[in-house]
């Protein structure tokens, strides 16, 4: 299983971090060991002093593919949920200054939170999908697919031009504005529309 992540896929998020808006998807990856299943404890990593949350819609790949046509891309994923791409922002900042890869900041064990899955039916993809993240009962992030720079199908097509997609692969499709720091004791809840997909406490 591979975990693909898309960076800077919402204009306002790119701006809040001082990044340029990309003209094609920014792709990075996490290993299988980064996946944290729902209801599993999450522990603040000892190597970071600035841990940030990034809520995202996540797709589950349901069909093997390579060089996928955008018009056929929706046939290659059948599940959707909300997850968190946890980022050691202090480590990322140091790596970016040196022009180094981000894995130490993004791909460590349990850094990819995943909620319960919702099966996709075609009608779901014909209207905008909204999602949100609450921190200690207060909303901190809201996103909607119409604000994405690259759509689900564009993302799938672009990834498949470089990597083979396999059944069970996951695609984190990017985070909206509102990312921020978290501390031990914070409780996060991720929502797909009005449906809660996960609850997570930082320990």
Predicted regions and their residues:
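Catalytic-core "active-site belt" of small-molecule-metabolizing enzymes
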Residues: 1-162, 166, 170, 178-203
């Amino acid at each position: 299983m591979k975990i693909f992540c898309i960076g800077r896929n919402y204009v306002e998020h790119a701006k809040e971090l001082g990044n340029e808006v990309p003209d094609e998807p920014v792709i990075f990856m996490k290993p299988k060991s980064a996946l944290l299943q729902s209801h599993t404890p999450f522990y603040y990593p000892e190597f970071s002093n600035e841990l940030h949350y990034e809520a995202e819609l996540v797709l589950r790949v349901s069909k093997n593919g390579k060089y996928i046509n955008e018009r056929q891309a929706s046939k290659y994923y059948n599940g959707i949920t909300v997850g968190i791409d946890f980022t050691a922002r202090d480590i990322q900042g140091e790596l970016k200054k040196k022009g180094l890869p981000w894995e130490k900041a993004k791909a460590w064990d349990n850094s990819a939170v995943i909620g319960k899955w919702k099966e996709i039916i075609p009608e779901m993809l014909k209207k905008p999908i909204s999602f949100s993240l609450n921190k200690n009962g207060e909303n901190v992030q809201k996103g909607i697919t119409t604000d994405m720079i690259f759509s689900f199908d564009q993302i799938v097509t672009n990834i498949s031009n470089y990597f083979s997609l396999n059944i069970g692969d996951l695609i984190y499709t990017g985070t909206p504005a509102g990312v921020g720091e978290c501390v031990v004791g914070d409780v996060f809840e991720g929502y797909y529309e009005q449906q809660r997909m996960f609850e997570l406490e930082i320990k």
